Amino acid sequence: KRIKDQLADEAMRSAVDGVAWHCYGPAEEATNMLEVAALHPDVPFYHTENGPHVVISERTEWWWAAKVFNMIQCGCSLFTSWNLCLDELGTPMTGAHLCGGFAIVDSATQEVSYSPQYNLFRHIGPFVKRGARVLEAEGFRDGTRLILFRNPDGEHVLVVACDGSLVRKIQRRRIVVKYKGLYKTLPLPGGQWSVSTLLFR
């Protein structure tokens, strides 16, 4: 409501280049942006602050897939993390929250490890090019999350996150993609989460 009111003010609108969103609620609340996008389709949206939790299990790759996919599908042209590099305890502390690092440096061994958010970003960033469009992808079902991009050169990038649950006790999930009249099947790992990136030309 606040953003709609501000953009309705002509003087304010003339000074605004875009809207920075912080999605602190559930991933599904990203749909709140759609009403603003419908009223102001020329205003860019950016997701500018959301980072890992110091307890890795609090925000898994599956958790991040819901957050990142929904924010982008609802209009954000970028998704920014928060702390680039912290130790395993989330220090140096930047506030009262239990923030983790995008990358984590072990304070004893100096070994570098990577957060679940980093792992998900690695399935998007290297493949989705500047100027890509987000396309509607049909076929969502329980246990999978999808997002589909088309790069400026015509290449399509499909990112699939799976929670690892089995369709039946002995049957793994699979993704069947129809592209240019041909069907391609991708079996997904069973019993564990996974993120897969498929490229189509």
Task: Spell out what each predicted region is.
Residues 1-67:
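Noncatalytic carbohydrate-binding groove/subsite architecture in carbohydrate-active enzymes
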Residues 21, 26, 52-53, 86, ...:
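Short, glycine-/Ser/Thr-/acidic-enriched flexible segments
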Residues 188-201:
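C-terminal beta-strand-rich structural cap/linker in extracellular carbohydrate-active enzymes
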